[in-house]
Structures are given as C-alpha cells and as structure tokens.
From Swiss-Prot:
Keywords: Glutamine amidotransferase, Glycosyltransferase, Magnesium, Metal-binding, Purine biosynthesis, Transferase. Residues 1-10 form a propeptide. Catalyzes the formation of phosphoribosylamine from phosphoribosylpyrophosphate (PRPP) and glutamine. It comes from Staphylococcus epidermidis (strain ATCC 35984 / DSM 28319 / BCRC 17069 / CCUG 31568 / BM 3577 / RP62A). Its EC number is 2.4.2.14. It comes from the Bacteria. Pfam families: GATase_7 (PF13537), Pribosyltran (PF00156). SUPFAM superfamilies: N-terminal nucleophile aminohydrolases (Ntn hydrolases), PRTase-like. Pathway: Purine metabolism; IMP biosynthesis via de novo pathway; N(1)-(5-phospho-D-ribosyl)glycinamide from 5-phospho-alpha-D-ribose 1-diphosphate: step 1/2. This is Amidophosphoribosyltransferase. Binds 1 Mg(2+) ion per subunit. In the C-terminal section; belongs to the purine/pyrimidine phosphoribosyltransferase family. GO terms for biological process: 'de novo' IMP biosynthetic process; purine nucleobase biosynthetic process.
Length: 494
C-alpha cells in the first residue's frame, strides 16, 4: 500500500527528562516521528515549578515555529506529540499534548492509539458532572485521574489505566516526573533511551532515539509504565492481566524502516515478508517494482528471492506531504496523481510484479495499475506483502468500518478484476507471523493481526454492536472457519 491509500496511523509521542535543551530535542524527535501524524503537533515543557506549552495545526514546521520555540526554551523536561485524528475532530482543541492547570498541580498528557470504551466512559463522566473541552478520547483519562480517591497522582494513574480499554501509549509530564504507559497488549509501541548526559527519552519508535544519538535502553512491555525522575528510571506494572499482541501493521506499514520494534528491525521484517511472499506466490515477469515508500523493502525481498531485477518503476514526489493524511477520499485520490509517477522508459512493454504492503479500499492500487499500463506496461501481477485486510481496526488505525474495506465484500479474484491487474495474491497469515518472527507465548506469537483475522486482543467494547451489525458474508465465513483466541472483551478463550 502506498502512502496515499487512506490508511492512517494514529499519532506519535515523545518525552525527555533532564536535558537543558529539552524543547529543541523534542522538536527533533517529533520530526523523526512525523510519518505517524501530520494534522498537528505540540510540545509541553516543565522546570519543576511551571508547565507551559505550544501547539498548532499542520506539519511540525507549520505547527511550531521559531517564535513558539522561543517561548519554551530553557526548560529541562518536555513531552511532544504529532497527531493524526483517529477519534475526535481536527480542530486545534484536539491537538496534543493537553495541558491542565489544577489548584494542586499541572499535568501535560499526550496519547497514541484509541480507547475503545471512551464513549461509555465519557457518558458516565458527563453524568457525574464532568465537562469536556475536546472530542479527543485522551481527555477521558485525565477526568478519571482527577476523580480518583487515590492518595497520589501515580496511584490515581494506575487506577485509571485499569478502567480504559484499547491500544494505547501515553506520555505524561508533571513537575516531578515523566511517565510512559503501554496498554495491556502492547499493541502500540513505546521505547526508552538514554543520552550521554544522562537524560532519558521516551518515544513511539527507536528512530526518534537514534536521531538524537541516544542509546536504546528497553521496550516498555504490555501493562507496564515507566516513571522517570531526577532519581532515575523505574519500570512498574499497573496490571498483570496482559497478553502481548503487538500491532502487525506497525511492521507492515506504519513504523519507519530504520526503527526496531520488540527486537525486530522493520526493514528486515518487510524484506523477509517479501521473500516469503515470493515463495508463496511466485510470478513470471521481467522485473519487480515496489510502491514507494513503505513497500520498497518487501519488493526488494521479493525480487531477491525470485531472481528478478528490482527496478524503480514508480517515483514519489518527496516534497508533497503524505496524501493519506487528507481527510476526504477525493483529496486522497487526487494526491496519488501528484505524488506518484511511472518511469515510462523502465516499464514500457514489460511484465511487472507490483509489490504493495496492503490493499485497504482498493482505490489507490487501481490508479497505480492504470498509471503503469498507460505508461506501456504489459502484464501486471500485484503481490501484497500482508494478508487480506478484511476486518476493521479499532486500536488507532483510521479504518473502523467494514464498508471501507474492499476485502470485506470482494474475493481476491473480484479485486483483481476491479483494480485491472492480471493476477493478485496475498501473503498468508502464517507467512506474516513467521516473517516478523516474534516468539511470545501468546496467540499469533505475540502479534495483533485483528485486521486480517477479526480476532481482537483488547476486545470491542463500544464498537461491538455496530461491528457485528455490519459484518459481511465474507467476514462471517472467515470467522466461522478459522480459530479465534479472544472474546469481545479481549479475554482469552479457555
């Protein structure tokens, strides 16, 4: 899947403790996480006495300009956020980190992922008199914390975390500490690094640690939270009801290829998936082409395994923001023409294996196939380095309805005809799991593959009724004929 198909990541979070240039380093860290969200960005800083922040709409360079940075320089602690809206509207009021000033403390908080029981929690809180200032589900946890009777902020945080469901990470800043939180399934990643001067870093991906020249310390695991203070770092647990289920889509599409998740480099995983795809679904052709940018690693693996030349038959305009961030399908489709072009002299008269990482709605791959054929390509064999994207995701990906998914209603043969390809094949679920190579004692070896299997490790909660109401016949058939490990509340079947 290209960067233009309408599949969107939720957000990226970053935090740093005890560095004299915390705001500047946070800005750099967020820049390396820009691929995770382009609708807005923000930074909150602290100096043990005061918390203050800046935020704005658009790319990081548009949201936080030099004059904003001058307002937050000189503070030693910071958190930052880049946003793509998976819940809530796209106004400035939803740009994070949120900054709260209470009579007894100030708190900055930002969030990556989606809370699948936020609607019901919000309703209960409003019935108790809570007033919300945004439509983002992140605000829910702050209300839960403030309504807790626990004696300390940390205890109130732990109590509140046990009430929320979904795939999430949080970065939270107070005057005394920096907190990092991971959901009970570790669906969304969070890592810790350390700089030469002793400053600690939290980030959604290791690439944000690497860009600052910091040392990777560890992943934060399922149901864990980290507390960073002037005394050092401590990793604790807020729940022992955990089952590791790391999002497969982080490896397939969302994360940067130079990032490492749970010990597995993203580029290496994608290349391995391309090799496995070639083993499972070879094709006779003159060359292999990948859809820029997230499919290039898989395409190189496919070409290497099958012994075909790997060519640059598609070129991406690197100076246009990623189209998938556009809020309407029409804008996304127009963006494909602006951002991708075929190299006619390479593809003219050739049989091509076109490798993409996924098909979600099918509109983008259809346009790319047409673009290549208009440029003279002969036969086009589409190979997808992931299984059929048949089920919606509720854990922070902007595909939360069955109607958006072409594989929910169409077979591979029907999709092949729809997109104008000469053949179409997908990587198997087992092939994906083995290519990634995790080895947790958990279903799917510790992967969350809900979009391919309809098996939801964190449950469905507020989404259950609508999800079940709109299940297609293909989805029902898949569920009936394949083993599922989790019930609608994310509990393992006994």
């Amino acid at each position: 899947m290209s960067n233009y198909s309408g599949l969107n990541e939720e957000c990226g979070v970053f935090g740093i403790w005890n560095h004299p240039e915390a705001a500047q380093l946070t800005y750099m860290g967020l820049h390396s996480l820009q691929h995770r969200g382009q609708e807005g960005a923000g930074i909150v800083v602290s100096n043990h006495e005061t918390l203050k922040g800046e935020r704005g709409l658009g790319l990081l360079t548009e949201a936080i300009k030099d004059e904003h940075m001058s307002n937050i320089k000189g503070y030693p602690h910071a958190i930052g956020h880049v946003r793509y809206a998976t819940s809530g509207n796209k106004g400035i009021e939803n740009i994070q980190p949120f900054l709260y000033h209470f009579y007894d403390m100030s708190v900055g908080i930002c969030h990556n992922g989606n809370l699948i029981n936020a609607k019901s929690l919000r309703q209960n809180l409003e019935e108790q008199g809570a007033i919300f200032h945004s439509s983002s589900d992140t605000e829910v946890i702050m209300h839960l914390i403030r309504r807790s009777k626990a004696p300390t902020f940390e205890e109130a945080l732990k109590e509140s975390l046990r009430l929320i469901k979904g795939g999430f990470t949080f970065a939270i800043l107070t005057k005394d500490a920096l907190y990092g939180v991971v959901d009970p399934n570790a669906i969304r990643p969070l890592v810790v690094g350390k700089m030469e001067n002793g400053a600690y870093i939290l980030a959604s991906e290791t690439c944000a640690i690497d860009v600052l020249g910091a040392e990777f310390i560890q992943d934060i695991h399922a149901g864990e939270y980290v507390v960073i203070t002037d005394e050092g770092i401590e990793v604790k647990t807020y729940t022992r009801q955990t089952t590791t289920a790391i999002s497969a889509m982080e490896y397939i599409y969302f994360a940067r290829p130079d990032s490492t998740i749970a010990g597995k480099n993203v580029h290496a995983v994608r290349k391995a998936s391309g090799k496995r795809l070639a083993q499972e679904n070879p094709a006779k052709a003159d060359m292999v082409i990948g859809v820029p940018n997230s499919s290039l690693s898989a395409a190189s693996g496919y070409a290497e395994e099958i012994g075909l030349p790997y060519e640059m038959g598609l070129v991406k305009n690197q100076y246009v923001a990623r189209t998938f961030i556009q809020p309407t399908q029409e804008l996304r489709e127009q963006g494909v023409r602006v951002k991708l072009s075929a190299v006619k002299d390479i593809v003219d008269g050739k049989d091509i294996v076109l490798v993409d990482d996924s098909i979600v709605r099918g509109t983008t791959i259809k346009r790319i196939v047409k673009m290549l054929k208009d440029s003279g390509a002969n036969r086009i064999h589409v190979r997808i380095a992931s299984p059929e994207f048949m089920f919606p995701s509720f854990y922070g990906i902007d595909v939360s309805t069955t109607a958006e998914l072409i594989s929910a209603s169409k077979s591979p043969e029907e999709i092949k005809n729809h997109i104008g390809a000469d053949s179409l094949a997908y990587l198997s679920v087992d092939g994906l799991i083995e290519s990634i190579g995790l080895d947790y004692d958990a279903p799917y070896h510790g992967l969350c593959v809900e979009s391919f299997t309809g098996d939801y490790p964190a449950g469905l909660y507020d989404y259950e009724k609508n999800y079940k109401k709109h299940l297609s016949e293909r989805q029902k058939s898949y569920i009936a004929n394949n083993k599922h490990y989790f019930d609608s509340e994310g509990n393992l079947h006994v």
